[in-house]
């Protein structure tokens, strides 16, 4: 899929934010708080890589927190922009799949995500419970958009001691960027109490444009072209070599195919980019628009009677 196509939700959101609408509008400002997990080469369960949540280790879920601003465009569409901090991590030591256990790599990544997404209403009830009091409303929505992501993977030697920045160590002799794009998509809901306090929940999947969230992607490279520390972090099979049930150490580390002359030992899976999942609770405070249209149409809900313009009688 071309990047120009993936930018369409972002451009559409900007267009809608700047479009004047003849209806009630509302801003709300709030926070996210929840967890994040990732899908990539690292860790996993007892099989080779599988898509989506089936290959995630729930015990590796870590903090996700952020803030956002949302504008309601109309009853079916809102635009949400926010900044989130989240941590994802993984370790081959935690998997029951032999080839990954033998690789024995690990990482953690503290990431910052700046996103813009469009939220599409699936279902809405403006008078939850149907009592005519209009004190609580409910909205179920789906969303999609675009995000800019800053990430910085770090790793340990055998999951002990200091964490080292992996990108400058070039463990696969690749100069990848700290910045990338992601495509967020998900579903959520919120309750609005007394038109001011909005409590919600959402879950979202992010597909990224990089395979280096975990610093693992292709094959083992020549350690002589790395620093001593980079070479140690690139291949950590030596810490588990000889453990019964794991593949032979010859399956790990730099080796050249005698026919093609290319590295032959697989370190990662370059056919799939890394992804991550967030699940957060949200709270926001609603600011209502005060246009003449809004006052005339909705004052009856607040108990304010509409009063027509009076004129003096003429005799």
Pin down the residues of each PLM region.
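Gram-negative (and chloroplast) outer-membrane scaffold detector with strong preference
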Residues: 75-77, 83-159
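Structural signature of outer-membrane beta-barrel domains
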Residues: 36-40, 82, 86-90, 123, ...
